[in-house]
Amino acid sequence: MSSPEGSSVTFRRAPATLRRPAIERFARRLQKEVADGAPFDTLITGDAELRRLNRDFRKKDYATDVLSFPSGGPGLGDLAISLGRARAQAREFGHTIEQEISILMLHGVLHLLGHDHEVDRGRMASLEKRWRAKLGLPTGLIERVQS
């Protein structure tokens, strides 16, 4: 559950080569700039855990790249990111795993803020594109699906 003080990132089964401090700094930047200071927590874990969470909470029995869980409390909510999916997508799109995790984190935070690209007629796609440009991130999730 989101802590009231600040956003946190928990790493499970992450390789030693993963630049954890950069990911943690990016989470704090998202909290400040995108979420208007509202904290959120991020779990970076494996495909098996994302599949279990997706099955338990969304009734979809497959691993996905990012899940968002709004809190309804003082914090924004929680994100779960699949390290395996992030690694594969980073390779596929030609950028670093840290960049891919940042893209997934931004996408998840926009969902925590109440945006839903499946029903909002492009509003979340526009927001994601604007924030990616401001934050210096490569092509995002919604653009990949739309192209």
UniProtKB/Swiss-Prot annotation:
UniProt entry tagged with the keyword Nuclease: yes
Q: What main location does UniProt list? A: cytoplasm
Which keywords fit this entry according to its UniProt record? Cytoplasm, Endonuclease, Hydrolase, Metal-binding, Nuclease, Ribosome biogenesis, rRNA processing, Zinc
What PROSITE patterns does the entry give?
UPF0054
Q: Name one Pfam family in it.
A: YbeY
Q: What is its EC number?
A: 3.1.-.-
Q: Which InterPro entries match?
A: MetalPrtase_cat_dom_sf_prd, YbeY, YbeY_CS
Quick one: which residues bind Zn(2+)?
H107, H111, H117
One Gene Ontology cellular component term attached to this UniProt record is:
cytoplasm
Q: What's the domain of life for this entry?
A: Bacteria
Entry coiled-coil feature ranges: none
Question: Which regions span the lipid bilayer?
Answer: none
Q: Name one GO biological process term.
A: rRNA processing
Top-level EC class, please? hydrolase
- Give the record's cofactor note, including how many are bound: Binds 1 zinc ion.
Its required cofactor(s), as named, are: Zn(2+)
Q: Does the keyword Disulfide bond apply?
A: no
Query: Any idea where this protein resides?
Result: Cytoplasm
Q: Name one GO molecular function term.
A: RNA endonuclease activity
- Say what the protein does: Single strand-specific metallo-endoribonuclease involved in late-stage 70S ribosome quality control and in maturation of the 3' terminus of the 16S rRNA.
* UniProt similarity note: Belongs to the endoribonuclease YbeY family.
Which PANTHER family does the UniProt record give? ENDORIBONUCLEASE YBEY, CHLOROPLASTIC
Q: This protein is called what?
A: Endoribonuclease YbeY
The organism that produces this protein has a lineage beginning with: Bacteria, Pseudomonadati, Acidobacteriota, Terriglobia, Bryobacterales
Q: What gene is behind this protein?
A: ybeY
